[in-house]
Amino acid sequence: MRPRRLRILVACEESQAECSAFRSRGHMAFSCDLQPCRKGGHPEWHTQMDVRPLLKGNCSFRTQDGKPHQVKKWDLVIAHPPCTYLCKVSSIHMVKDGVLQQERYKSLLNARAFFLECLDANAYFVAVENPLPMARAELPPPSCYADPSWFGVKYTKKTLYWTKNLPPLVAKVVNPDARSFMHCSRGKYRSRTFPELAEAIADQWGNYILDHPP
């Protein structure tokens, strides 16, 4: 079945790390985020909008350069939904003095609904990324995990994936001296996708899909 140009949506990605990795391999990948793509990025590959209409496929959209696009169905959807209200680390803010914080709990429910909507994207191959969730989020068990140190990065950052019809990522060049990325970074930078991990995703999952068409 090779070669074939895959139609790929990378949801909630303004860095374009994964989008660029797939593009460099000849695939038709688009990133989508509420924010514009990073300065120096590729606006011709990025659409700034709510991603939910795109998750269903059979969609029309414009990239940041103003060019219209139409996709009947995605081959692969990778999503990075916000983890602010879902992750285990944030659970300490959910209850104060023994009282459930209702506004924060509502935000958790909204975040959970969006996460599940990403997981239910209209594509045969799907991967949703997030850190370890709090029990209160009641997310399904993750399918696998990966770590950037598996691909030579000097930091460790365990990343969970909820997948459909995709194999776990396989370590290639493990960095034995890697240290925790969580302890030396903050905010949005902490949630970044390392280029080495993005390259591994494009290689391993891209090739798997080409070799195992639905």
Task: Mark where each language-model region is.
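Conserved active-site and SAM-binding loop architecture
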Residues: M1-P214
